Amino acid sequence: MMNIDDIEKQKESNLAKGVLTGYGVIAMCEVTNPSPLFYGVGGAHISSQDGASIRLEGSGAIHLSSSITEQGQGTEAIMKQIAADQLGVSMDSVRVTLGDTDATPYGGGTWASRGAGIGGEAVLKAARTLKENILDIAAAIMQTDKNSLDVENNTVIRKNGGEGITLQQLAETVYYRGCLLYTSPSPRDNK
């Protein structure tokens, strides 16, 4: 914030030297995360959509891929925080791949401040979907109702206490010992 008293003193000092000085204040609101119509009017033919893909790897770690790129505005950290928060895991267990057009979902790109707003929403939705899938599989493994489970500190826990299962154990079962699950291809079919 500016210090008006200092500015007034500077004005007086300048006036004594025959220099007229003034100051002004401006307020503005910059548009961010607009629709494709907004971009199109300006001649920028880009999409206002972005994609995110999140998967539980065989090690129990999380891999997040997004079409957004990091340009120094902290988008990678923001996306990692969103994923970790939604999944109930530590940020250290989330690996992020941004902007690799061979490996990430299609999207409109960062374009300055839209990265966290639009790309972050895609990460939020993808993380919520993955968590539901994790809880479905955990419910099948633990032979309990999925609504009695949650994920905290990289572990699927029973809300009322009792033994849980780490995401590493869950991932090892899914990737390497699927025969231990129910006979149906989807735990949702076994309810």
Residue spans for each PLM region:
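Glycine-rich and small/hydrophobic secondary-structure elements
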Residues: 1-4, 107-141, 169-178
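Polar, glycine-rich mid-to-C-terminal structural blocks
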Residues: 156-158, 165-174
